[in-house]
Amino acid sequence: MTALERLYNAAVVPVVVLDDAADAVPTAKALLAGGVDVMEITFRTAAAADSITAVAKECPDMFVGAGTVITLEQCKKAVACGAKFIVAPGYSEEVVSWCVENNVAITPGCVTPTEIMAAMSHGLKVVKFFPANVYGGLSAMKALSGPFGGIKFIPTGGVNDKNLAEYISAPFIHAVGGSWLCAKADIAAHNFDKITSLCKEARKTALGFEIAHVGVNAGDAEESLAVCRALDAAFGFGVKGGNSSNFAGSGVEVMKSPYLGKNGHIAVKTNSIPRAAAELAKNGFTLDESTAKYKGEKMVAVYLKQEFGGFAVHLLQK
């Protein structure tokens, strides 16, 4: 898995400011306990290099990178300490060139068309957008994604638990960065349980799992329609016909022939099927790729190989 794939799957990239390198590993472990396996340790303090070294050595499951990298010297030092990716607040030709030449993942800060074009000239497809709340937030990135459709953004600055869902659901957002997950004060006070809790909530928001509908296996098209009409007669759900199934309202799908799941199926909506797949894989669940449905090149539905209480489960892209 590439560095950019790790960042995408994580969805949230904690921006970590450490005054004491001794807090680096406990902070990393708190993030991991909350389901977040990437962290950006910023070069805003003298403890940054030692902190990166400690996490790289002692927390192999954590994908650690360096942030607020302004100079080439900082960049080289960060990589030597074990940083797997570099994040810069602005665009530096010197830093970007070195990273590209040395196969180091970098997301430079780009908020103008000129900066984005400079990043593209090096083959970069993901850039940092900072400070997002100052430079127009989602509306600005949406406008930039028009002429630069191949570019994805990692906004930082003004992103928090209240607007995370709005940010992460935008198609031009690769991931989001922020310090709200592990505030400097919480690290200093060793409020690691709080950090873990915030990470769990952020991951829950980013994945956006919701029950979409329940599927019923009917014997044939006639039975499917009859079931839907009966539900409509009882509850006024309405009936909507389809190619392989009929719906009673939006909550019950009745298949026109027996399909997956002894008892039927459950559809679960998510903000991102790729992120959901990565999360499910961590917990021992796998996708049945043969059932995948696409809209263009984007997967919009796919079943899991496992059943739950006799029900098959499929993901549904929001």
Locations of regions flagged by a protein language model:
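Catalytic cores of alpha/beta
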Residues: T27, T71-C81, T114-H122, S139, ...
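Vicinal oxygen chelate
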Residues: G251-K256, A281-K318
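Catalytic beta/alpha-barrel core
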Residues: V15-V17, D37-T45, M62-I70, A83-Y91, ...
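Conserved, mostly hydrophobic/aromatic
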Residues: P14, L31, A78, V127, ...
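C-terminal helical cap(s) of enzyme catalytic domains, especially alpha/beta-barrels
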Residues: C99-V104, A185-L207
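Glycine-enriched alpha-helix->loop->beta-strand junction motifs that scaffold or abut catalytic
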Residues: L32-D37, E58-M62, A80-I86, E101-T107, ...
